[in-house]
Curated annotation (Swiss-Prot):
The name this protein goes by in its record: NADPH-dependent 7-cyano-7-deazaguanine reductase
GO biological process entries: queuosine biosynthetic process; tRNA modification
Keyword Cell wall biogenesis/degradation attributed: no
Subcellular location: Cytoplasm
Role according to the record: Catalyzes the NADPH-dependent reduction of 7-cyano-7-deazaguanine (preQ0) to 7-aminomethyl-7-deazaguanine (preQ1).
Species for this entry: Pseudomonas entomophila (strain L48)
Signal peptide per UniProt: none
Family indicated by similarity: Belongs to the GTP cyclohydrolase I family. QueF type 2 subfamily.
Active-site positions on this chain: C184, D191
EC number(s) on file: 1.7.1.13
Entry keyword Metal-binding: no
Main location: cytoplasm
Transmembrane segments: none
Length: 276
């Protein structure tokens, strides 16, 4: 468990405060987990973003009439802190009985508070239900590898030694899996996800990738660190010209978290999958 997470509200009984309370946000420094991976915060080997989507966003108009919407928050992957998810939910719930003059005022408030907690500017978008409904759901790009026949009996820790690739053949391809699962390091609750890998480099053995992803099944870590571990393990093996790892996790507590790590400075689309 991350030392800072022990002091967060995650896994503890909490009072639900219904009026604006930005102090509920609980930042957790990324540095300790980066150190575990052998990564320096001064020279990160990736670019990217963490997309958070909130499906339980509500506030009051000046008349007292409530509004519901869906919030999208883009936290830079190089921000000093992640925001602990339960504290994020409690903070958003504190808006439920708070009046805002306009959506613009709400967005400015959210951006100010979340940026302060993350330690870097967080982009905020508030959408109507109709706008999000019109977007529908999408599918991951590339070939799904989930039908491959693999055997595995160890799920406690990620096993990069399972990964295999060709040392003679270079390919450019995109593959994905819906079998990613890890556990919350604080509560032990399951985190279900889908992950897409896009790269140009040594040809990755698809069955070995699937087995490797399944090896995360009982691993306890936050979403962001799981994706960063996958990225680093693949980067070491494939020696790619470029590499992207993008995970879309199933929501818990009205929030889903979607980390994106890449060698390239390309902003991904934040489009929902069928399980989201």
């Amino acid at each position: 468990m991350h030392p800072a997470a022990e002091h967060s509200p995650l896994g503890k009984s909490s009072e639900y405060i219904a009026t604006y309370t930005p102090s509920l946000l609980f930042p957790i420094p990324r540095l300790a987990k980066w150190a575990e991976l052998g990564v320096s915060g001064d020279a990160l080997p990736w670019q990217g973003v963490d997309y958070w989507n909130c499906f339980e966003l509500s506030w009051l108009l000046p008349s007292g009439k409530p509004v519901v919407a869906i919030g999208e928050f883009a936290i830079p992957c190089d921000s000093p802190n992640i925001i602990e998810s339960k504290s994020f939910k409690l903070y958003l719930n504190s808006l439920n009985q708070t009046k805002f003059e306009s959506v613009a005022q709400l967005q400015a408030c959210l951006a100010k508070d979340l940026s302060a907690a993350a330690g870097k500017v967080v982009a905020v978008k508030v959408s109507t239900l109709a706008d999000v409904e019109a977007q529908g759901v999408t599918t991951l790009p590339g070939q799904c590898i989930d039908a491959l026949d693999v055997t595995i009996d160890n799920y406690e820790q990620p096993q990069p030694e399972l990964l295999r690739c060709s040392t003679e053949r270079v390919v450019e391809e995109t593959v994905h899996s819906h079998l990613l699962k890890s556990n919350c390091p604080v509560t032990g609750q399951p985190d279900w996800g889908s992950v897409v890998v896009e790269y140009k480099g040594r040809a990755l053995d698809h069955a070995s990738l699937l087995t490797y992803l399944i090896s995360f099944r009982q691993h306890a870590d936050f979403h962001e660190q799981c994706v960063e571990r996958i990225y680093l393990d693949l980067k070491k093996l494939l020696q790619p010209e470029y590499l992207t790892v993008y995970a879309r996790y199933v929501r818990r507590g009205g929030l889903d978290i979607n980390p994106y790590r890449s060698t390239r400075a390309i902003s991904p689309e934040n489009l929902r999958l069928v399980r989201q």
